[in-house]
């Protein structure tokens, strides 16, 4: 594969394939979230090491070819996608849009609107794949890559060894760039301004997600020696905890820039007073739809049935979350850990206790 060893500028995307993968991933998380209807056993072989590339909806011709050539990578594409969705759900857990899609919605519905939510979806899943592939390389699970080949950082102390097995972030970035962007290269529609607008937006946000992982990667060091001494000091490159990536992208979601696309396919800020976006900013071209009500056309679930916080003035409060429809208070029984005790050695053992609590549910 060409171009997997250096950082390049962004080019096209993949979201239909990712959303297809979600159908198996998210049936394990919550049945109503992002379900597309393809069974896991049809996507992966019995051992989770073989992917049936011809069974996957949404792949372009080049993506299908890459899927066959790099078949062992696809399991980690799914794992990264799953990680991205779970982080998306956590980041938006108290919002009207909580990274959910109606179970009967097709995967292209979430991308029918070029909103801030679509921007975040592209970025977080793209970043998830980069981290998943980078760590799979380090673990020796992929034949095409291994430990990071990054050069020794200039600021590293002379008595520290550079050579521990680090996450192969450069290969992971290159593979994600090549695979994710293949769909846009295959399905170009230069005369359709709407398609060009979405393509330019998605290209940018995918790169923002990838670069979020690349730029947050850091040097990690460890001491080795007899009886706790630090006679040997070893350092390596490590990708960050994914929550760090989620937090960064959530902030960029809040600060996302509204764009317009010129007849030449170039993105420009919609308002002249706005700054030009950097390659790590999120951008969008459409206003967000109404997430208060069910919208089958766009696969929006609405907020009816969502739990709200009675005393909160934020979006998770009953006043905002329920969109003025009011709420119902119910006494429900929950199971919580209790009577926890430290056991030698070394874990905490808890009992499971039932407790009745009040919950407020949007009408």
Swiss-Prot record:
Disulfide bonds join 88-99, 137-145, 147-165, 221-235, 223-230, 292-323, 308-318, 322-362, 338-353, 340-350, 345-346. PANTHER family: PROTEIN WNT-5, WNT RELATED. Belongs to the Wnt family. Its main location: secreted. One of its GO terms (biological process) is neuron differentiation. This is Protein Wnt-5. It is found in: Secreted, Extracellular space, Extracellular matrix.
